[in-house]
Amino acid sequence: MKLRIFSIMASLILLLTACTSIRTSSEGKQKAHETKTKEHIVIAAVGDSLTEGVGDPDGKGYVGKVADSIRSDKQVKTVDVKNYAVKGNRSDDLLEKLKDKKVQKGIKDADYVFFTIGGNDLMKILRQNFLQLTVEPFQEAEKPYEKRFEKIISEIRELNDHAELIYVSMYNPFTFTLSELNEINGVVTDWNHIAEKELKKDKHAKIVHIEDLFNQKSDSSRISEEDDFHPNGTGYSLIAKRVYQAIKKEGLPKE
């Protein structure tokens, strides 16, 4: 009788051990699946010349350089880049661009959406008021720009509600050519605040500040000698480093 009880108890112990082992193994596999980095990542990029990569000798710009950094992750097999940025585009041009079916398809498929905008909006105001330049025209343009910026985010989110949306801030491109226009620094700061305020409303959106990379005379080595306006290869590498750091902080997208 005692032998039979001992045999039953031993069987129960073995059964419980097996069940626990199966459950632990299953939970481990499930956890591994939940935290697995995506093997195939898609980046869509829209906006102006800064996102297009104008001034970079190798043509990659910050978008291509960030893609290269993501490719260096051992868990990532491919990074597909769809860059729809156009030199000279203002915020109203970008809103029109977002109506393009090809652009919409690219954004829908994206894990990341990178964009820059606003620099050409400022440039338009500067050209129109160059002979009598004051801060007033820029201040008057802030509200309309804020509405367009908000609309840009809204349009992107209608196409894709889960992608990480990364806006690269504006910098003062006249630091190296028209340094006497000190007021532009304040205008750029104000317009970046507008963008940051709107982006904070979206939990999957962020601004990457780069204005400090191009705000000193000594930073001129980061600007293209061809136009004294856009970043060169070094400048774009520094921008890409900032963007990639922001991405790594949040972690690459999961399966």
UniProtKB/Swiss-Prot annotation:
Task: Tell me the GO molecular function terms.
Answer: lysophospholipase activity
SUPFAM superfamilies named among the record's database cross-references: SGNH hydrolase
What PANTHER family does the entry give? SPORE GERMINATION LIPASE LIPC, THIOESTERASE 1/PROTEASE 1/LYSOPHOSPHOLIPASE L1
Q: What protein name is recorded for this chain?
A: Uncharacterized protein YpmR
Q: Which organism is it from?
A: Bacillus subtilis (strain 168)
**Organism lineage string:** Bacteria, Bacillati, Bacillota, Bacilli, Bacillales
**Protein's gene:** ypmR
